[in-house]
Amino acid sequence: MSGFANTVYADLVGQDQVIEILQNAVATTRAETEPINYSIHGMTHAWLFTGPPGSGRSNAAIAFAQALICPNNGCGSCKECKSAANGAHPDVEIVRTEGLSIKVDEVRELLSRVAWAPAMGGWRVVVMEDADRLTESAANALLKAIEEPGNRTVWLLCAPTLHDVLPTIRSRCRHLQLVTPSTDAVAQVLQTRDGISATMANFAARVSQGHIGRARYLATNETVRNSRSTIMKLPLTLQGISSAFAAAQTLIDLATQQATEAAETRNEKELDDLSLAYGKGATGRGMATGGSKAIKDLAKEQKTRQTRMIRDGLDSALLDIATFYRDVMLVQAGAHDALVNKELENEINTMAEKTKPQATIKKINAIMVARTNLGHNAAPLLTVEALMCNLAR
């Protein structure tokens, strides 16, 4: 990674091959004449970044956007790079959905915004962080724009896997697959860039399994570490139906608490800003036209966002629990040296002795099914209760 220090790619851990492709694409644009010939050089009008959670697919897309509009090919320090990263550059649109899906009306509104030529004379870049959340009608609306792009418009789509994006869209994109960084690489980044102790960095990197954002969050937040500790002990409490329901409620409570705390400050600031814009303190006729509706719309948006945050929190918790059973399976296979949860080694060994590998595999599969169901908008409490009952068997 040393070769990419002090550039927009500095935070992409273990993605050297992807970075080199992006750097080459940016370099070819500097020598291009109008119109851009996408068929010959490394640049193209649509890119699809895929990779597991924590691989940095969104960070890679945003870094590429910065490099395209940067006069120095992505220095990371100029005003263009900084404004693009913050979503404040007029030619860089970063689409982040706060809800469970991206609807067709949102895509149509986006298309109307990006239809104009670049304001600064370079590129107009659209980063869509959650392309996998496009509804079918929204994806079809986006397809037309990708099929007939402006000469200086670049689409950067992000999704966990190729199969999370419609075939008609992915076939028109250049695909870049990011990988999960090694735990050693993540630990090194936490130490050198965040000043975290070696012990804490190694722990956070190990239990996050290479998810650098999650690792940093764990390493710097004691409350999050305590919540994870509670979650990791839940499998040990599953002795029957009543304990399964209690464990499910604990998961729901923890996810709700974390989502509420994370959203509280942001929600308050958004409401204050909106109230100020429409005449703070005024009511009824004293409030600017549309103010009441805007506040109601904001409340609805915030509720949707919190719902997604709860689901994301549950998904993260289920992944953590899956690592417990993964460790049990490794011990049952005789591999004691590759445990994720070394702090629970005694408990893992005990469960490995009491259960069979086939049962462990079924439990891991049940967790993955529950995660899929949550992603498909299943009721969180019922989904988690059913899962805990399966794990208690």
Residue locations for each model-derived region?
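Charged, glycine-rich active-site and insertion segments that engage polyanionic ligands
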Residues: 1-66, 83, 152, 160-317, ...
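Conserved alpha-helical scaffold flanking the Walker A/P-loop in AAA+ ATPase domains
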Residues: 23-25, 34-38, 104-125, 133, ...
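Short loop/turn elements that form and flank the Walker-type P-loop nucleotide-binding site
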Residues: 42-43, 85-89, 119-122, 136, ...
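Post-Walker A helix-loop "phosphate-sensing" segment adjacent to the P-loop in P-loop NTPases
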Residues: 65-76, 150
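AAA+/P-loop NTPase substrate/partner-engagement loops
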Residues: 74-103, 164-165
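Conserved catalytic/switch belt of AAA+ P-loop NTPases
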Residues: 115, 140-157, 167
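Conserved D-loop beta-strand region of ABC ATPase nucleotide-binding domains
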Residues: 126, 156-159
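Conserved Walker B
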Residues: 130-134, 162
